């Protein structure tokens, strides 16, 4: 029996569009909740030991409820859930997400966001087929990358309550911004020398403490470097591969950028052995990652 591949591809795009529409709905709801939510802490910790904010849990519950309604979703994996949550045995896609990245900054009114990775059938780097993130700031913004090899698409919420396409995002070969994370006293000498070189070349420091907003700024401004290295207290980095790192690696590489853990040619080469695994990570234009490899001894 011959399979109609056009029908299969059409069904996949239909399912993905349903997922993206759900992400749009989620973004609008979380954006409203943030305005008036209780910003206190719960008595619980997530799988990586972070004490959960009530807003983290509320955002996670919103996303879970929305995606449970989709027959194409096989399972959900969240930064705020210890285990994978099965949804539909006949579903095809696993959604891995950070419900509210930078949530501890809401009390000082910084921009925060949600990150989504869409995996086909299995949670493997090569199975990540689409990614998206939303930004909750002065404006509600959304970036969707629906296919490998295509540029990420940037949207902004309009007065009519609908997201309006603004433009495709593309990184220049060399940028001007340097968003460097982790506590400096824990940096290696190699990393310190690398960052100092960027400043010596005239890069401007732009770091808020929310991964999603810092990476968003670099994308919109055309280039630069975001780094969260291995440190003495977090030798495997602190950012989570499935929920945060790989979705942004997908978007950055499709925007013409490059990613690395300091050793690899791409973050997609990192071997994942557990759901909440973390990794050092570097996202940037080609020039910044080439300089990274020079300092880290890859070349």
From Swiss-Prot:
Indicate which residues the UniProt annotation says bind Mg(2+) 1: 79, 98, 100
Q: Which Pfam families match?
A: FBPase (PF00316), FBPase_C (PF18913)
Q: Mind naming one GO cellular-component term on file for this protein?
A: cytosol
Where is this protein chiefly located?
cytoplasm
Cofactor binding summary note? Binds 2 magnesium ions per subunit.
State which Enzyme Commission number(s) the record gives: 3.1.3.11
Binding-site positions, substrate = 101-104, 207, 238
The biological pathway it contributes to is: Carbohydrate biosynthesis; gluconeogenesis
Which enzyme class?
A: hydrolase
Endpoints of the signal sequence? none
Q: Where in the cell is it found?
A: Cytoplasm
Q: Which UniProt keywords apply?
A: Carbohydrate metabolism, Cytoplasm, Hydrolase, Magnesium, Metal-binding
Q: What residues bind Mg(2+) 2, as annotated?
A: 98, 101, 244
Gene Ontology MF annotations: fructose 1,6-bisphosphate 1-phosphatase activity; magnesium ion binding
Catalytic activity from the UniProt record = beta-D-fructose 1,6-bisphosphate + H2O = beta-D-fructose 6-phosphate + phosphate
Question: Which one GO biological process term can you cite for this protein?
Answer: sucrose biosynthetic process
Cofactor dependency: Mg(2+)
What quaternary arrangement does the UniProt entry report?
Answer: Homotetramer.
Matching entries from PANTHER family are given as:
FRUCTOSE-1,6-BISPHOSPHATASE-RELATED (PTHR11556), SEDOHEPTULOSE-1,7-BISPHOSPHATASE, CHLOROPLASTIC (PTHR11556:SF35)
Family to which this protein belongs: Belongs to the FBPase class 1 family.
- Name used for this protein in its record: Fructose-1,6-bisphosphatase class 1
Q: What is the taxonomic lineage of the source species?
A: Bacteria, Pseudomonadati, Campylobacterota, Epsilonproteobacteria, Campylobacterales
Name of the coding gene: fbp
């Amino acid at each position: 029996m011959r399979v109609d591949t056009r029908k299969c591809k059409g069904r996949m795009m239909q399912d993905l569009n349903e997922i993206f529409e759900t992400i749009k709905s989620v973004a609008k709801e979380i954006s409203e909740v943030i305005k008036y939510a209780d910003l206190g802490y719960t008595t619980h910790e997530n799988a990586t030991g972070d004490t959960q904010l009530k807003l983290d849990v509320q955002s996670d519950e919103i996303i879970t409820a929305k995606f449970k309604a989709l027959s194409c979703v096989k399972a959900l994996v969240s930064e705020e859930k210890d285990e994978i949550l099965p949804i539909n045995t006949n579903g095809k896609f696993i959604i891995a997400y950070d419900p509210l990245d930078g949530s501890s900054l809401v009390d000082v009114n910084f921009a925060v966001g949600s990150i989504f990775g869409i995996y086909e059938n299995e949670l493997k780097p090569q199975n990540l087929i689409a990614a998206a993130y939303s930004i909750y700031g002065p404006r509600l913004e959304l970036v969707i990358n629906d296919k490998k090899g295509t540029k990420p698409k940037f949207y902004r919420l309009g007065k009519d309550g609908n997201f309006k396409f603004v433009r495709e995002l593309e990184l220049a070969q060399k940028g001007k911004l340097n968003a460097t994370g982790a506590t400096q006293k824990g940096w290696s000498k190699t990393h310190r020398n690398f960052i100092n070189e960027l400043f010596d070349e005239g890069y401007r420091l732009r770091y808020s403490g929310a991964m999603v907003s810092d990476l968003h700024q670099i994308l919109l401004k055309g280039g630069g470097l975001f780094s969260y290295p291995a440190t003495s207290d977090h030798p495997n980095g602190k950012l989570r591969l499935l929920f945060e790192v790989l979705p942004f690696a997908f978007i950055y590489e499709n925007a013409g950028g490059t990613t690395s853990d300091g050793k690899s040619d791409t973050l997609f080469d990192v071997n994942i052995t557990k759901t909440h695994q973390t990794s050092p990570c570097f996202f940037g234009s080609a020039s910044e990652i080439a300089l990274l490899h020079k300092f880290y001894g890859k070349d």
